[in-house]
Amino acid sequence: MTHKIIVALDFPAGAPALALADRLDPARCRLKVGKELFTAAGPDLVRALVARGFEVFLDLKFHDIPNTVAAACRAAAGLGVWMLNVHAAGGRRMMDAAREALESLPPGDGAADTPQRPLLIAVTVLTSMSAGDLAETGVADTPAEQVMRLARLAHACALDGVVCSAQEAAGLRAALGADFRLVTPGIRPAGAAAADQRRVMTPVEALRAGATDLVIGRPITGAGDPLAALAAIQADIEENLGRAF
């Protein structure tokens, strides 16, 4: 099976995002909708992507009091999304409330073609954050140490996985087991610019380190032929790992 990369739709409006989606194949990739696009285009954009057959990762990083986050998770499930996330820094009670809100939904509550509840993952440390950045917020640990602490908390709250840098993936995989999803942004094919993410790896490096889901944006969305760019990355994964990953 071809590895389904999560393509980040980092667009300022709905029209170019939908135009890009129409040049991709839902059998080959999933799509990520983040804060900018969701703020500009709203829930209707998510519904339109789901209607096109795409599994959508709603990347809004909910972080609020437990009741508010639980309500937001239920609303996201109603859009038919495949996966959503919260900030692990919101703490145990917030993550428990988010998980319980999704577990309380009957099968099919999200959408007619989405019988299972959305996956719920937690954000650990943003990939743009360095040790110095963390220190300025009062966190004395290194990014890797803080990632491990927050990932262990998310695991204890029975979430499905975490967002993390691929550089932390091997340690998290060893500590948290084979069934915990590791969703890794900061992925750039060999030769691509790192842009605004500091802790980056290539797709093959990230998968070898233990990542389960790769988030890739500009190398695909900025390509003249996005589907060909996606296929090239997937072919490189298969060639280097010896199988379709």
Curated annotation (Swiss-Prot):
List the InterPro entries.
Answer: Aldolase_TIM, OMPdecase, OMPdecase_AS, OMPdecase_bac, OMPdeCOase_dom, RibuloseP-bd_barrel
Single Gene Ontology BP annotation? 'de novo' pyrimidine nucleobase biosynthetic process
Cite the EC number. Answer: 4.1.1.23
Q: Name one GO cellular component term.
A: cytosol
> In which residues is substrate bound?
10, 32, 59-68, 127, 188, 197, 217-218
Please indicate which superkingdom the organism of origin belongs to: Bacteria
Database matches in PROSITE patterns = OMPDECASE (PS00156)
Recorded hits in HAMAP family, A to Z, give: OMPdecase_type1_B
Q: How does it assemble?
A: Homodimer.
Task: Name the job this protein performs.
Answer: Catalyzes the decarboxylation of orotidine 5'-monophosphate (OMP) to uridine 5'-monophosphate (UMP).
Name-wise, this protein is Orotidine 5'-phosphate decarboxylase
Which species?
Thiobacillus denitrificans (strain ATCC 25259 / T1)
Q: Which gene encodes it?
A: pyrF
